[in-house]
């Protein structure tokens, strides 16, 4: 058994293809696959089980993980650290922070931790996992795969009504003011875009801190824009009827044509395969930074501000309830 790959949101549209690729080409990996609902009543989790059932020699576990509760995330990480220390599972080779949340149809949602839900699920909770689990990586290093999107760049999303700009008061990323005016789609899309911008900027800071550490210098972090996935279930969850209709009658059937105007338009299977290749260092070996699909790319000018990157790094530690020292990394 060569190493453990942790994948959040493992029953997602692209994630199912990530799992399939790993099973087909890296059956020696131990997969820890997290989902919100592990019950048989969840159709998407059953699709994951069906994929796994095709490989009776696969080594895996499907585990529940509610990213909207930081207490649950901390406990999950502690359990995994203990399992690795005890030799019950192999050391980590990769963390794939795939799970995400957005809501374009209702007012701002706050978690019991007091943070806006999109920000917590997409960024804060995944930062907890990464920071708590750094010490469980192999001495040879590994890879952290984070997810951003073209929405981080002002003007690139057709759904954008409010530009994604890091607020002067960083606490507003996690605790934004009420939606004014009450345009749920505009504000929901903006919260999603800001979470992707925060992830991207945190990734740059994370890499700098990893490189300063003799213990973690061989761990590389990437933030990938996986593309606009024409068949993603995300287009049909917490989205207005207009987007759902566009997904069904325009985006999916016309994908080959739309690709001429948007080269990042592709299927979940294409994205999921690329994500798997990144996780095992087949793609872009040793690279740290931003990717569009599997192309090394330059992110938005705003995202490259190193001062703000470090400010987000410090604030994320605070939100996550973790000190740099506890993570074993320089502050």
Task: Report residues per predicted region.
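Rossmann-fold NAD(P)H-dependent dehydrogenase/reductase core
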Residues: 2-233
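Alpha-helical packing segments of well-folded alpha/beta enzyme cores
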Residues: 76, 199-202, 271-275, 312, ...
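C-terminal helical subdomain
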Residues: 251-297, 306-308
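Alpha-helical membrane-targeting segments
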Residues: 183, 228-267
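Residues at helix-coil transition
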Residues: 24, 82, 279-283, 321
């Amino acid at each position: 058994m060569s190493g453990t790959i942790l994948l959040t949101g493992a029953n997602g549209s692209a994630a199912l293809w990530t799992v399939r690729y790993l099973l087909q080409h890296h059956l020696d990996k131990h997969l820890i696959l997290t989902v919100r609902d592990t019950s048989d009543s969840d159709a998407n989790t059953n699709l994951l089980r069906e994929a796994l059932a095709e490989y009776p020699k696969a080594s895996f576990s499907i585990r529940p993980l509610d990213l909207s509760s930081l207490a649950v995330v901390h406990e999950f990480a502690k359990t995994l650290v203990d399992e690795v220390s005890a030799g019950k599972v192999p050391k980590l080779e990769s963390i794939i922070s795939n799970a995400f949340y957005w809501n374009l149809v209702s007012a701002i949602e706050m978690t019991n931790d007091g943070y806006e839900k999109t920000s917590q699920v997409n960024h804060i909770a995944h930062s907890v996992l990464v920071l708590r689990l750094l010490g469980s990586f192999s001495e040879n290093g590994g890879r952290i795969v984070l997810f951003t999107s073209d929405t981080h760049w002002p003007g690139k999303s057709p759904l954008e009504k409010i530009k994604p700009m890091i607020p002067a008061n960083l606490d507003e990323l996690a605790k934004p003011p009420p939606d004014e005016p009450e345009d749920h789609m505009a504000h929901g899309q903006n919260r999603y875009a800001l979470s992707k911008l925060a992830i991207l900027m945190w990734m740059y800071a994370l890499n700098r801190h990893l490189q300063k550490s003799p213990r973690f210098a061989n761990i590389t972090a990437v933030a990938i824009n996986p593309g606009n996935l024409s068949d993603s279930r995300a287009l049909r969850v917490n989205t207005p009827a207009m987007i759902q209709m566009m997904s069904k009658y325009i985006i999916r059937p016309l994908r080959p044509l739309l690709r001429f105007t948007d080269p990042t338009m592709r299927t979940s299977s294409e994205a999921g395969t690329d994500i798997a290749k990144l996780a095992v260092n087949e793609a872009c070996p040793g690279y740290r930074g931003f990717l569009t699909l599997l192309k090394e790319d330059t992110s938005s000018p705003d995202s490259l501000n190193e001062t703000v990157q470090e400010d987000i790094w410090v604030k994320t530690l605070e939100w996550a309830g973790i000190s740099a020292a506890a993570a074993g990394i320089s502050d």
